[in-house]
A protein has these predicted regions:
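Conserved N-terminal beta1-alpha1 strand-loop-helix module at the mouth
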Residues: 30-118, 122-125, 186
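Active-site-adjacent beta->alpha loops and helix N-cap segments on the catalytic face
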Residues: 78-94, 108-112, 138-158, 175-180, ...
Length: 266
């Protein structure tokens, strides 16, 4: 009986993954463009330009924000304290700001997360594109999935009241396969818009980030119920294009790696 249940579950995952890839390929066919034919700007639209390092000076943050806007990145992912600094450089562009919430640990109280999210979506409605929050991966490791779901849902409900999409970071390098798969369903149940692999700031574990295996695992679990963002260790053009081939929706890429994945000569 157990073997049959495992077979059925594996088959469902495979079907969900195949359906997702089929839909993506149909969309590619509609535009009659392969990734190799896509312009730099079209490829940049997959990118959340990560400007999160705590040692960045305000001047560096402004320069990197301007760079991301010029390239046409989907968002500039920044720490909340720099929203006012970056806001003038976003207005009138296709690029939006994506602040992080309770980053990078996800260990604050639910009330604290909701309060931070509310400040951001109320104060920056004209420039905020999405909000990235960190799931409490210590509780995930402990198997406290109901608490994890409730925590995520509180922030998601707050953001959705103002039509702001939410991405949920798992920190997959700290989790095993079962934990990753179950957390995908926590996010679906909470109404999240994206599942996301990594913060890029985890210590004490080997850094693998958005591997093909992890992204496929997430895609299998969420199907068409949620989008998938890969983040962490996307540093080569080959990896970047491979994830696009897999049907990924978004990628978080650091400032040093953006020129590499976009094949820019600087």
């Amino acid at each position: 009986m157990f073997i049959n249940e495992q077979f059925v579950l594996a088959n469902k995952r495979k079907c969900a993954y195949n359906a997702r890839i089929r839909t993506k390929k149909e969309n590619y066919n509609e535009t009659s463009k392969q990734k190799s034919e896509m312009s730099t700007r079209e490829l940049a639209a997959y990118i959340d330009y990560s400007v999160l390092k705590p040692e960045f000076t305000p001047e560096q943050i402004v320069e990197l924000t301007k760079d991301g806007v010029e390239l046409g990145c989907a968002t500039i992912c920044i720490n909340p304290g720099y929203m006012d600094l970056c806001k003038p450089y976003i207005k009138g562009s296709e690029t939006k700001l994506c602040p992080v919430c309770d980053f990078p640990f996800g260990t604050s109280s639910t009330e604290s997360k909701v309060a931070q999210a509310k400040i951001l979506i109320d104060g920056y409605a004209d420039v905020i594109g999405e909000l990235d929050i960190v799931a409490n991966f210590g509780k995930i490791r402990a198997g406290l999935y109901e608490e994890v779901t409730a925590d995520i849902k509180a922030v998601v409900d707050t953001c959705h009241a103002k039509n702001v999409p939410v991405k949920v970071i798992f920190e997959t390098d700290a989790l095993n396969e079962e934990q990753i798969r179950k957390t995908c369903h926590c996010c679906i149940d909470a109404g999240a818009d994206f599942v996301k692999s990594s913060t890029g700031f985890l210590t004490g574990f080997e850094a693998h980030g958005a591997t093909v295996e992890v992204i496929k695992m997430m895609q299998e679990e969420v199907g068409d119920k949620c989008k998938v963002k890969g983040s962490g260790c996307i540093r080569t053009r080959e990896h970047f294009l491979e994830l696009i081939d897999m049907g990924i929706d978004r990628m978080g890429v650091g400032y040093r790696s953006v020129p590499v994945v976009l094949d820019l000569q600087r």
